[in-house]
Amino acid sequence: NHTYSHQKGWGMSLERYIEDVDFANDLIHSELFRPPYARITPAQARALSQRYKLVMWDVLSRDYSRSLSPRKCLKNVTKHLEPGAIVVFHDSEKSFRNMRYALPRTLDKIRKLGLKCKTIEL
């Protein structure tokens, strides 16, 4: 779950933010939650952590940036790969060009480094 409307939570009331997250969950049924923009207020985190496992990332591909070349997107990710890293790629029209180039090459690099992709445990 990543909210329904991808709003910046720090600019929303707690109640409205929780409603948005729950609305998304009614559609996708996930016990995981990652806040948009990796930002969440302490009150939102406390409320959501009672119902969801909050997951943050530590490697941002920036694949959504149209000013970023696909090669630079790949470099943004591969220079930060390490055991336990959580990498963010986006599934959107805006990010498609960079993600299509960088994701398979990132997976190849992960294999070459002897790292493994794992499911986040609940």
What do the PLM-derived regions correspond to, one by one?
Residues 1-72, 77, 81-94:
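Metal-dependent polysaccharide deacetylase catalytic core of the NodB/CE4 family, i.e.
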